[in-house]
Amino acid sequence: MPLPPRLAYALLIVSACSAPDSRIPALDGSLALEIRYPRPGEAAPAEDSVALWGTVGTGRAKLMVNRVRVNVEPNGTFSSFLALPPGRSPSLRFVAHRGNDSVVRTILLRRGTPNSSADEGTPVSEGTVREWGRWVTMRRLLSDTADRATHLRPIYSRWRPGGEVAIPIPQGVRLFANARTDRSIRLRLASDEQVWVPLADADTTARARPMLLRAGPPQLRSDSTEMLISLALPERLPSTVELSGDRLLWTVYGAEWTTRPASRDGDSAPIRRIVPRNAAPGRVVVDVGLVSLPLGWRTEWREGALHLRVRRAPLPSKSLHGLVVALDPGHPPDGTTGPSGLSEDSVTLAVALVAADKLRQRGATVILTRTSGRPLSLEARAVVAEQSRAHLFISLHLNAPGPGRPPSAVYGTQTYWMNANGSALARLLLVEVSKAMGQPAIGMYQGEFAVLRPAWTAAALVEGSGIVIPEREAFLRTQAGIDTYAQGVVNGIVRWNRAADARALPVSRRR
């Protein structure tokens, strides 16, 4: 139940005026007001409150924002959550003073809407949807020559222009576009399924082909590390792989079997049985029954066939010898800056380097997505996850509150997973990082992150702590803070490697 406006406002004032944190080292510098957040022109959420953080340069200064006193920590930093004045263009007036010296800044904001996103376009905003009949080849333009990962990644289609991600479509695939807007085209995948992609990612000079291509029967091969299921096809087609309880459902679009191939048994774990079926005109499914949770899976095209590679999970072990771990220090570009100016990307790199050293001492092989402050795109990080031989992929981050949420909301550790093979890793990292950092475990969540899309490894994203909280930022400035975060990551990996339940299949969903 929402709080009455006056009570909510009073609680915000009490929060802003809380006592200074004695764990933060004192700093007696010059008066210098630096507002890290919000930035001028920032969209103010419809909740009518805004988080703010920054520094006044000295712990001996006082700060007022819109005539509300905001607590200044011993090192001069501040972090608070204040009500906004009404109107379409609210403002925040900061007044910092120490003795006879004072600094005044005004931040102009613009009113936003609840749960809004600048990326959330619609067909209407792109112009009228009109019929279109043309074969196209998916091909992304290489816009950044410094980052050649772009041409290796699929194009992620959406259920509507600017909407939720649908399925990945490999570059080079030829599909039929039956409608378009000014900037997007609609692709026919099957008789009952279609998706949207940017027009810029399509070569519209493609030759026509039959609407449905005949697929060969599934062929199975295996070795000590993986199993390979292959479908012969005249050319590459888009496909998806979904883990549903104790089954992997491999759906291939634009294919058909004139006679359904026979089912067959798998020869060993993790595959129990393979059942092919025509799901709908233009969509075939290879239903792969599982004995245990695979380490990962991916599809690839080579030698005239579409292949599903299913990795065997390593056996539980107390030793890390033979384990390959990919660590991804989150950002740059972007990333959050803490109240005193500590950058998220500098901390995540330091943590990754320490964690890598600790893991190598235990016998693991470690791959780092970056070893310097040079920006690296999400596409390039995802390529490392999918092209490497890593068993685990862990993306390291620090947290900041979303619009309309107070800084206190990120006091603790959060983890994210996307594919089910990363769920156990996310759970164990949540427990161990929060325990090491001496802070709450906020929770683990399933999230759609670009770096977690590849299912080839068990992958998780860790928000180790809230960098916008002055005490946490001050701790992360120290070597002890870096070592502590890194040790929590290592402990989570060690527990994953030992745990038999990390290889357990998720509970089956009823169909």
Q: What positions do the PLM features span?
A:
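C-terminal motif of bacterial Sec signal peptides marking the signal peptidase cleavage site
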Residues: 14-16
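Active-site-adjacent mobile loop/cap segments within catalytic or ligand-binding domains
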Residues: 395, 402, 414-416, 445-511
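Solvent-exposed loop/turn segments at secondary-structure junctions
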Residues: 332-334, 371-376, 398-403, 420-423, ...
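Short linear recognition/processing motifs and adjacent strand/loop elements at protein termini
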Residues: 18-29, 59-62, 69-325, 351, ...
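Active-site histidine-acidic residue metal-binding/catalytic motifs
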Residues: 309-384, 388-392, 402-405, 409-411
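Sec-dependent signal peptide recognition
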Residues: 2-10
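Short, compositionally biased P/S/T/A/G/V-rich stretches that sit at domain boundaries
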Residues: 18-45, 49
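Short coil/turn motif common to extracellular beta-sandwich-like domains
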Residues: 43-51, 224, 281
